[in-house]
A protein has these predicted regions:
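Buried, small/hydrophobic-residue-enriched core segments of structured protein domains
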Residues: 1-183
């Protein structure tokens, strides 16, 4: 795949073409209905949650400490897609670098689960309807997009939290998209 060190050389069509060719397009989900978007669809906005309120989940801020440059590059790349902007939800004590852009808006949420669910955040920021579609994407997918556009290579690694009552040695584990949890646990 082609690499783009200079983000200003990108266009919406070039971003979409590269996401489709690499297979990363399938990382996006529509709201309502949580479907992979059609290639010619255009969302009003894209939402990314950096809040982990569900029990036993990986803390996005912990993960992003190692990947913040790729995440921010990926944010700039996907900001070419929506009609309006990309919304990032964080906790009020989020302490990593943020991008200053007219196309990227940050929102703070605190509280118990389900505050970390992107659907809850969409409802509070910009509710969807039958006539208004937005997309969502996972923060690790944004990192993958950043790496793809920076380096031209597809990195399908994932960090997962292996924990719970059936796990004798809880840990964070590096794996690949599609790995069988029963085989690695």
């Amino acid at each position: 795949f082609e690499s783009f060190q200079d983000i200003s050389k990108l266009s919406k069509d070039l971003v979409i073409e590269n996401l489709i060719e690499s297979g990363v397009w399938t990382s996006f989900r529509t709201r309502p209905f949580s479907k992979i978007p059609k290639i010619n669809d255009e969302p009003e906005e894209i939402f990314i949650s950096l809040i982990s309120s569900d029990p036993l989940s990986l803390d996005p801020e912990f993960y992003l400490k190692k990947h913040i440059d790729d995440f921010n590059f990926g944010l700039e790349v996907i900001s070419y897609i929506p009609k309006n902007c990309v919304h990032i939800s964080t906790s009020s004590n989020f302490d990593l670098s943020k991008i200053t852009s007219d196309k990227i808006n940050y929102h703070e949420f605190d509280g118990l689960h389900p505050v970390g669910l992107v659907g809850t955040q969409i409802h509070r920021i910009s509710p969807v309807s039958m006539n208004k579609t937005v997309w969502t994407i996972n923060y690790q997918d944004v990192v993958m997009i950043g790496k793809l556009f920076k380096s031209g290579s597809l990195d399908t690694s994932r960090t997962v939290a292996l924990c719970g009552p059936q796990v004798s040695e809880p840990c964070l584990m590096e794996t690949e998209i599609g790995a069988s949890i029963s085989e690695i646990s």
